[in-house]
């Protein structure tokens, strides 16, 4: 079927675009009456107002014409459990709760350009994705990516952290690392050349082979100053001090990570947004920056499966307010680790600036709250 357009005048102009790859009624069911069409799919002045489950093709794949849709409006797909893929190459803005509760959504394609719909700075209002746009979608969904489009890797890595994507679909993953990296039985044990990470371009990204399951003790610690991001789809364990004092490290993407050792990310003042959907155990001082000159910049941290948090894990001097997502109340060690530490049981989160904790209503019931707060965290519910 050729691309078709159906225009209705109902006091305002509604435009519905069928897909170029549309194959008869199996691809897209068009309701028979104008009233039903207007309630299922609405596009007004380039804004997708709604796209109901009844209009979703039987294969679950929705494609939006880039000439017709530039914004996905608030709640446009909310609760659509039939949606499996969304292809929207012309979209630059995604409003609140746009895909909230789309529990079958596994692939998102915004055209795989230089960057996803994400503002690089707060002053840029031409492109954005609302904080809760993808809440309630699978943690193992993927975002399309094209390494030949001159992409900004750092913006993509921040986007998939904040909006809970497991992979960049299309990223080039090496089958092995150069000889400067020592790997044995799936464990990255050491880096033999201190210049191994030089010449990685303005993004400073290291992409690990998927067969690397563990990063050994102190491998990257205190060695590299132009190392901005690391991407490893297979990493499950990180041993003590692996990234300690990597002062330039901004993004860490390990979607299968289950445990991290002591001081793994200590004195990493430039870390910004992290999502570890399967992380269960965090050892002592893992993100601690007590006494550091540079403040902590972590503004977003998602740990929905964490069960055990060691002492002093997030203690330090913060520059910004932090948003943290947790599941049920974890076991937290509040033991002071030095004599001059706060003795009031706050040391593990000491120094955080008015932190916000997001939990589901069912998980909230597991928390012990004092005056509506949990160790200084204001509680908000994910609904």
Regions from the language model: what does each represent?
Residues 3-6, 18-40, 46:
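Bacterial Sec-dependent N-terminal signal peptides
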Residues 6-14:
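Sec-dependent N-terminal signal peptides
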Residues 37-44, 55-71, 81-93, 103-128, ...:
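Structural signature of tandem-repeat unit edges
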Residues 121-123, 132-136, 159-163, 265, ...:
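A structural signal for leucine-rich repeat
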Residues 368, 375-383:
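Solvent-exposed adhesion/ligand-recognition segments of exported proteins
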């Amino acid at each position: 079927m050729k691309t078709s357009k159906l225009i209705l005048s109902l006091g305002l102009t509604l435009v519905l675009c069928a897909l170029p790859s549309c194959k008869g009624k199996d691809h897209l069911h068009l309701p028979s009456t104008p009233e039903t069409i207007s309630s299922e799919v609405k596009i007004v002045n380039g804004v997708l107002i709604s796209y109901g489950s009844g209009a979703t093709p039987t294969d679950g794949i929705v494609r939006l014409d880039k000439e017709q849709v530039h914004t996905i409006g608030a709640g446009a797909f909310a609760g659509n459990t039939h949606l499996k893929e969304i292809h929207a190459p012309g979209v630059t803005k995604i409003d609140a709760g746009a895909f909230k509760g789309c529990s079958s959504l596994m692939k998102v394609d915004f055209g795989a350009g230089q960057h996803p719909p994400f503002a690089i700075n707060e002053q840029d209002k031409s492109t954005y994705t609302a904080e809760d746009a993808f809440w309630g979608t699978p943690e193992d969904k993927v975002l399309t990516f094209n390494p030949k489009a001159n992409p900004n890797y750092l913006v993509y890595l921040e986007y998939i952290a904040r909006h809970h994507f497991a992979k960049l679909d299309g990223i080039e993953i090496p089958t092995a690392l150069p000889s400067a990296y020592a790997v044995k039985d799936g464990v990255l044990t050491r880096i033999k050349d201190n210049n191994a990470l030089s010449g990685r371009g303005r993004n400073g990204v290291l992409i690990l082979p998927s067969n690397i399951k563990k990063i050994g003790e102190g491998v990257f610690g205190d060695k590299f100053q132009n190392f901005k991001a690391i991407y490893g789809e297979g990493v499950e364990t990180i041993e003590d001090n692996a990234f300690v004092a990597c002062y330039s490290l901004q993004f860490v993407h390990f979607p299968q990570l289950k445990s991290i050792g002591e001081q793994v990310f200590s004195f990493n003042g430039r870390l910004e947004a992290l999502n570890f959907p399967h992380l269960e155990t965090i050892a002592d001082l893992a993100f601690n920056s007590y006494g550091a000159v540079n403040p902590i910049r972590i503004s977003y941290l998602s740990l929905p499966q964490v069960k055990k948090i060691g002492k002093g894990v997030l203690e330090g001097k913060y520059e910004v307010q932090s948003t943290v997502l947790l599941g049920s109340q974890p076991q937290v060690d509040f033991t002071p680790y030095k004599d001059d530490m706060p003795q009031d049981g706050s040391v593990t989160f000491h120094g955080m600036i008015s932190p916000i904790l997001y939990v589901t209503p069912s998980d909230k019931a597991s928390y012990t709250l004092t005056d509506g707060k949990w160790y200084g965290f204001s509680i908000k519910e994910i609904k």
